[in-house]
């Protein structure tokens, strides 16, 4: 019974599935991905869905553009009046909504082809589990981790931005969540409700857009790290895979396993996967009979093809996200600086909830920068470890036969892959620390300017 349950679990973990369900739904809410993806064909229903999709997209543009425009007008009207706190607060919202508009256009209109290529290639071609050998890993661990991270991040974004909607309700003064200039009296009955609804929609769009752009990057990095885990296990078991294709007997498999176990002593070999052992009896069921040279070449070529697939996917991700992160690093730097400044200026008696909201904004900005840099760093570290995985196989047993192939792979795999911001700055934990340092340097300068006034 226990064995049957384990077999069913392994079979379920090895199934091919859509890896982007939740993040794709979030992009649809943000109008960064078409709802029509879920409707195939060209019938009446498909036409209706496309029409509703376009209407929803245009409405979202209207909401975001009109709020950004109102804030720009507010900055222009109040410029030079000495209220630096209000000016900076308007500048924060202007940056946020301009970035929201830019992300919608970039994902939906500027580069949808590359986005679809990345998602479809990873979904269609990823390896669900490692090659046959003494042990195996599946994509289940990285898939679960990607779902956990993206859901946590998306919910935090929604909570952080929608919290602003609670302020007017708490104050009960018919104020708006976003304090900006309007060319009419928005406090009139009926008008206030419509304006409040539009601002609420705008805040939801901000949350969805920020969560989609950074969240998809995080999911891609976690899944690629999962593919590296699968590759590492396949490389470690490349000789075991060869022996299985040769039709080795139990004695030969036991001897090879003993030598591999002696070499396989490093803990923490995988980023997200849990390694499981394969019973030797199952390896005997394959029933193949090849010579070692042919069997090894077949097993090794599969590993090389998998490595090329991972590198090709990373190049597409870099091409798509590198321009975004080039602008994003500057945007995050200024946002952290401005939000921290406004938080320190909020000292009025009724500003407690506003300080909480600003504190949430600051934490979300830091959280976003962290996931961008941290998961890119994980990918970079994994890209350097292919050679280590290969050395965990008992290579000395067939040194003469495998030496040239091993050396060829080692030389090529040493070229690690680094995700960047505009091909200028590497995305890693050092970039995270450096951006925070720069932001608080600007904060100090801003506070000195405010003190002079």
Swiss-Prot record:
InterPro entries: 7tm6_olfct_rcpt. It is a multi-pass membrane protein. One of its GO terms (cellular component) is dendrite. It comes from the Eukaryota. It is found in: Cell membrane. One of its GO terms (molecular function) is olfactory receptor activity. Keywords: Cell membrane, Membrane, Olfaction, Receptor, Sensory transduction, Transducer, Transmembrane, Transmembrane helix. Residues 50-85, 170-203, 344-359, 430-453 are extracellular. Residues 1-28, 107-148, 225-322, 381-408 are cytoplasmic. GO terms for biological process: detection of chemical stimulus involved in sensory perception of smell; olfactory behavior; protein localization; sensory perception of smell; signal transduction. The keyword Ligase does not apply. The chain crosses the membrane at residues 29-49, 86-106, 149-169, 204-224, 323-343, 360-380, 409-429. Belongs to the insect chemoreceptor superfamily. Heteromeric odorant receptor channel (TC 1.A.69) family. Or2a subfamily. Interacts with Orco. Complexes exist early in the endomembrane system in olfactory sensory neurons (OSNs), coupling these complexes to the conserved ciliary trafficking pathway. Odorant receptor which mediates acceptance or avoidance behavior, depending on its substrates. The odorant receptor repertoire encodes a large collection of odor stimuli that vary widely in identity, intensity, and duration. May form a complex with Orco to form odorant-sensing units, providing sensitive and prolonged odorant signaling and calcium permeability. Involved in the behavioral responses to pentanol, ethyl acetate, and propyl acetate. The atypical heteromeric and topological design of the odorant receptors appears to be an insect-specific solution for odor recognition, making the OR/Orco complex an attractive target for the development of highly selective insect repellents to disrupt olfactory-mediated host-seeking behaviors of insect disease vectors. Odor-evoked OR currents are independent of known G-protein-coupled second messenger pathways. This is Odorant receptor 83a. It comes from Drosophila melanogaster.
């Amino acid at each position: 019974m226990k064995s049957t349950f384990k077999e069913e679990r392994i079979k379920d973990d090895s199934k091919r599935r859509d890896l982007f369900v939740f993040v794709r739904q979030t992009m649809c809410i943000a109008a960064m991905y078409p709802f029509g993806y879920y409707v195939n064909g060209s019938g009446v229903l498909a036409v209706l869905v496309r029409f509703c999709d376009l209407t929803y997209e245009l409405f979202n543009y209207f909401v975001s553009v009109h709020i950004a425009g109102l804030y720009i007008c507010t900055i222009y009207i109040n410029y030079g009046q000495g209220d630096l706190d209000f000016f900076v607060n308007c500048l924060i919202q202007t940056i946020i909504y301009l970035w929201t508009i830019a992300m919608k256009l970039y994902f939906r209109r500027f580069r949808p082809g590359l986005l679809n290529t990345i998602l479809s290639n990873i979904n269609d071609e990823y390896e669900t589990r490692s090659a046959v050998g003494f042990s195996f890993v599946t994509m289940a661990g990285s898939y679960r981790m990607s779902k956990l991270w993206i859901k946590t991040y998306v919910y935090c974004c929604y909570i952080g931005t929608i919290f602003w909607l609670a302020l007017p309700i708490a104050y009960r003064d018919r104020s708006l969540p976003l304090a900006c200039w309007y060319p009419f009296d928005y406090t009139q009955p009926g008008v206030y409700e419509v304006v409040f609804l539009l601002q609420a929609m705008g805040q939801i769009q901000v949350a969805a857009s920020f969560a989609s752009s950074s969240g998809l990057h995080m999911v891609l990095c976690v899944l690629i790290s999962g593919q590296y885990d699968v590759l590492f296990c396949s490389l470690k078991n490349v000789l075991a895979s060869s022996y299985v294709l040769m039709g080795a007997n139990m004695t030969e498999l036991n001897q090879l396993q003993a030598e591999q176990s002696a070499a396989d002593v490093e803990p923490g070999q995988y980023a997200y996967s849990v390694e499981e052992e394969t019973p030797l009896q199952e390896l005997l069921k394959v029933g193949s009979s090849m010579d070692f040279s042919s069997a090894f070449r077949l097993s090794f070529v599969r590993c090389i093809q998998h490595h090329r697939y991972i590198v090709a996917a990373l190049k597409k991700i870099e091409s798509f996200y590198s321009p975004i992160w080039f602008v994003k690093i500057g945007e995050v730097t200024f946002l952290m600086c401005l939000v921290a400044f406004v938080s320190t200026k909020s000292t009025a008696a009724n500003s407690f909830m506003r300080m909480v909201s600003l504190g949430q904004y600051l934490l979300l900005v830091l959280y976003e920068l962290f996931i961008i840099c941290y998961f890119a760093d994980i990918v970079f570290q994994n890209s350097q470890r292919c050679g280590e995985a290969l050395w965990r196989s008992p290579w000395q047993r067939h040194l003469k036969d495998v030496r040239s192939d091993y050396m060829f792979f080692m030389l090529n795999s040493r070229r690690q892959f680094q995700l960047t911001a505009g091909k200028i700055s590497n995305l890693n934990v050092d970039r995270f620390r450096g951006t925070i340092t720069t932001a608080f340097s600007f904060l100090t300068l801003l506070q000195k300017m405010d003190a002079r006034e």
